[in-house]
């Protein structure tokens, strides 16, 4: 519903601004430019979607091997000690625990098709424990904040889009996204725990979060000792080594489980073309809307207005052109994806704005969509502090993304 209003707004605002330009400033080129943008954006959306097919097929095939090889189950077991402490109100041994672990593990691996059904199942099981069926419980809120914070280990789709948009190293945003999404998730856990009076000084929580924070701090410190050229080389090499290790680990997991690895890959890869075709109408819709909005001059007015405010406060304004992706992400995944593609098209995939847009896209998730779908599936209408915690986690992710982008690419 929110995206519907935003999409309508793109056209209405663009039309009003174009009329003002025509009537008061004699700009006879604005309407031809807007119409040209609709054709160009439609063509771009189609070409991008088809170009995604090969890389999507590759990674969907790899993910299918990991899924059948038990990687999701293994990750769920690894996460269980910390998550038990974050959900103290769930009775020990209740089946919802398994569903929550599996959902978070699937999300971390980028297995959206598996994560959503598991998440809906977890909500149904949490609702069984809910004494007030129309009101969100603490475990429900913690579960959804972990989802909205966007914690992911493998940002496949973003790397795929960067490859299609001509990035020299599509994986160079891999480590920055890992760092940004860590801060988003950490903020979400801390804020929600404070609301729910969960003891963050518990030994398990301290060791897990503290250990993860130390690793992240070490990474940031290590990269901080390098000049920009060496940092780019090391981060790109490290990202590609990690991705290759993940592929090898998934294959070995399949071999260990006696899975026919080749057949599993083919089974997953078949979905690549279907997925690429399925996103065509969504990408056409959002890119055309953004194209009209940009061609009318409205996007420049918005960005320049924010730049003026940031500049007046003495801040660096390089990040401002990427902000539309960050602002759209809590509202709509497809809308934010369109903003990201538009930023890479306009400024270049390897520009600071293009890279930061990708980090924004990977650092958080679609907060309002997730809350609407998951709470709506069980009839919960009183969300309590869910929206506040989710949006504060998003804000932390956005701030972290900007700082990390300046560190790596500024």
Predicted regions and their residues:
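Signature of multi-pass transmembrane helix bundles
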Residues: 1-54, 163-293, 311-313, 385-410
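Generic hydrophobic alpha-helical membrane-segment signal
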Residues: 2, 91, 98-100, 135-140, ...
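Hydrophobic alpha-helical context, especially transmembrane and signal-peptide helices
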Residues: 5, 33, 45, 94, ...
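Short glycine/serine/threonine-biased micro-segments
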Residues: 12, 59, 68, 108, ...
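Membrane-embedded alpha-helical segments and adjacent helix-loop junctions characteristic
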Residues: 30-128, 257-346
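Hydrophobic alpha-helical segments, principally membrane-spanning helices and signal/leader peptides
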Residues: 36-39, 46, 95-97, 132-140, ...
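C-terminal transmembrane helix pair
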Residues: 114-115, 122-161, 167-197, 323-410
